[in-house]
């Protein structure tokens, strides 16, 4: 990306200023931070500032993941990495339009195909990051809602391996299901420490081999057992098909 604009640039026609600045366009197009698209981009900006990333390079929308945090860490197999790849997802109870009720909170966790160096899309679909940060704007009062006040945000940090193991190819996850994954929960001031904890701590580093798979199996057993207690036989059938048949299950709240 080229040099970042300041907002003071004139919009010109026939070599003359029209009387409008680039900042006028920004103000017109980007003031409603409750808009789904803008809220997603703003969430990435929030996380970037919390991690003290270099934001002078501008927003890049076509990378396989959203943000890269320079930090040296080691996985359970002893492989060392110099950065943490971060995927940022956002959701909000309130929307720009008039609502009869608050929105259900659902985040996208869809596996994606990345662009290869030759310009073609990879045939393999997977989650590309090391860590997911789920950003929830938790304000429910439209009259007082202001996404610029970061006290109103909640952040849930989950290692990607856990989504892969527990959710498989699932495309979305509800807030209730996300909380069952035992994420690291943080406010704005705790995002950086949560990322470090996630890649260094035992709860976010996958155990090796058989133990890893066994732990994931037990976790899903417990989740489905809990649902069976609430929902009856349907959840037991779901558990059966989860492990003994092809069953594409998307969790709901």
What are these regions (language model features)?
Residues 219, 231, 247-249:
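Acidic/polar hotspots within intrinsically disordered regions
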Residues 227-237:
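Positively charged N-terminal leader segments that act as targeting/secretion signals
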Residues 1-84, 88-222, 253:
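Nucleic-acid endonuclease domains
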Residues 41, 245-248:
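Exposed, low-complexity/repetitive linear segments and helix-based recognition motifs
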Residues 213, 224-226, 240, 248:
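Intrinsic-disorder-associated, low-complexity terminal segments enriched in Asp/Asn/His/Tyr and depleted
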